[in-house]
Amino acid sequence: MQTNSSNSVPSAISDKYTQNHMPIAIWLLICCALVFAMIVVGGVTRLTGSGLSIVEWKPIVGTIPPIGQEDWEVLLEKYRQIPQYEQVNKGMTLDEFKGIFWWEYFHRLLGRLIGLVYFIPFVYFMVRKRIDRLLGLKLLGIFALGALQGLMGWYMVMSGLADNVYVSQYRLTAHLGLAFVIYAAMFWVATGLISPLNTHLSDPVSVHKLKKFAWMLTGLIFVMVLSGGLVAGIHAGRAYNTFPLMDGFLIPPAMFVLEPWYRNFFDNITTVQFDHRLIAWLLIFSIPWFWFKAKQLSLSYSGRLACHLLLLMLLIQAGLGITTLLLSVPLTFATAHQAGAVLLFTAALWVCRKLS
């Protein structure tokens, strides 16, 4: 009887902890949803060539959209001063300019909204003393990453305003990668508040090994996201629109045509796409193997469900990637592919959480 009572203590503490922190977890998950939307809108902004349509960074005044014809003419004239207009969109009409302007405008507006949705509840929870010191430091760290992301976004845009017609693929990849880091941090903290303690029916040693495997997969997915940023940055997806071979080659002959050799991994369309495919193939083989290993353990229902969702998202994301490639990067499928990357990453994080 005493044993049952003592076993119920950790459960009671866990339930109390979860109940106290549930509003904070919900708030963070809402922020995750907004960051997810931000990543998707950012993808559309890139795919439609809209990212350089606003050539100034005005965090406060920039919230107000153009109102009359005169405002629009001023914005278009500023756009005409950058290389992209001269070399890519020369002769663009005002209506055509509006089409690219609104995507960039809403992308920036969504960033400002995320800042408010994060900052205001954070201050509220701090004032109400709902956040302890450790959690407060984590949340402050996330806020700092968000501020850095705003600066990174403008730093990326600057790379396309002077000498280039597109933004730097390095800065684009850093901007995308930082968005995933912010998303992961908020998701991890939120899910930790919802389920801070997990118990497993399997032996701890096997679960620990599986957890290390899960983290390896999560890291590999993140590397694939960064690789996708490079693919997008140099428009590598519009070449080699065949599968599974690259225009008939397993290893294309143009892999190392640039000097010095390491430039090929960042600037060579052939090598950048090959690397993205290679990482995808590693995941295609690794995640089913992980799923098979997980099935051999007596995980909780939610743990098994997380593993099933990871495998399902892999299949969906692989299908979206292949379709996007074969159709030469159409807007709909390319956007879905970017959204799928977030969902696959989320599934991997959820698996890691359930194994913690």
Curated annotation (Swiss-Prot):
Compartment(s) of residence: Cell membrane
Membrane spanning residue stretches: 24-44, 106-126, 139-159, 174-194, 214-234, 278-298, 309-329, 331-351
Binding-site list for heme: 276, 337
Membrane topology recorded in Swiss-Prot or TrEMBL: Multi-pass membrane protein
The enzyme's E.C. designation: 1.17.99.9
Swiss-Prot/TrEMBL catalytic activity: Fe(II)-heme o + 2 A + H2O = Fe(II)-heme a + 2 AH2
Highest taxon listed in the record's lineage: Bacteria
Enzyme class: oxidoreductase
GO molecular function annotation: metal ion binding; oxidoreductase activity, acting on NAD(P)H, heme protein as acceptor
Main location: membrane
Keywords: Cell membrane, Heme biosynthesis, Iron, Membrane, Metal-binding, Oxidoreductase, Transmembrane, Transmembrane helix
This protein's pathway: Porphyrin-containing compound metabolism; heme A biosynthesis; heme A from heme O: step 1/1
Signal peptide interval: none
Entries under InterPro entries matching the protein: COX15/CtaA_fam (IPR003780), HemeA_Synthase_type2 (IPR023754)
GO biological processes: heme A biosynthetic process
Cofactor: heme b
Gene Ontology, cellular component aspect: plasma membrane
Stated family: Belongs to the COX15/CtaA family. Type 2 subfamily.
Cross-referenced HAMAP family: HemeA_synth_type2
Assembly with partners or alone: Interacts with CtaB.
Function: Catalyzes the conversion of heme O to heme A by two successive hydroxylations of the methyl group at C8. The first hydroxylation forms heme I, the second hydroxylation results in an unstable dihydroxymethyl group, which spontaneously dehydrates, resulting in the formyl group of heme A.
Name used for this protein in its record: Heme A synthase
Lineage: Bacteria, Pseudomonadati, Pseudomonadota, Betaproteobacteria, Nitrosomonadales
